[in-house]
Amino acid sequence: MRTLVVGGSGSGKSAYAERLAASLAPRRTYVATMRNDGAEAAERIRRHRSQRAELGFITVECPDSLMAACQDGGSGVVLVDDLGNLVANALFAPDGTMADPAVVLERLVGEVEALGQSYEHAVLVGNEVGGEGTYRLESTNEWVRLIGALNCRIAASFDEVVEVVAGVPCHVKGGVA
């Protein structure tokens, strides 16, 4: 089963995705997409690793590409948290330059498909974006458009789409109506 879990900031989407993934298989891989770019990020990563270890997840750090996680596939479940970080890391280089969004989209769609085929189950956490209107910086608007397009492409090919609102999972596609 392949499931996309989306929600706004603080909606509970990650906690729901972790519970879902833990229920699907005893072999659990957690793909972390946050870039380690300083002491604060390093501490957050350390804390998250510790929390996930208690749930039986093996963590694979993939801030720029999902392909490294494909090598560990097979039986079991993979949880990617989250697509927003992955898109930002792929779109914006550390020096601030921006990649071609169309190229980034196609690359990430290909990586998601490869990951979904590498594991028995895949759970991806995406960000619900775009409802806030437009942003002052065009680069932020480009990120919003790209994450929205990626969510749509994943939703079209995955078995299940769940939107988490205030901690409540709402099945949009597949699953329980």
Name each model-derived stretch.
Residues 55-104:
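Helix-adjacent hinge/juxtasegments
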Residues 4, 77-79, 123-125:
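Structural motif
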Residues 2-72:
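Conserved P-loop
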Residues 26-29, 76, 121, 160:
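Residues at the starts of beta-strands that form the adenosine-phosphate
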Residues 14, 62, 82-83, 128, ...:
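Generic detector of well-ordered alpha-helical packing
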Residues 10, 35, 84, 129-130, ...:
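Short, glycine/serine-rich, charged loops/turns that create anion-binding
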Residues 17, 48, 79, 127, ...:
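Residue-level signal for inorganic ion chemistry
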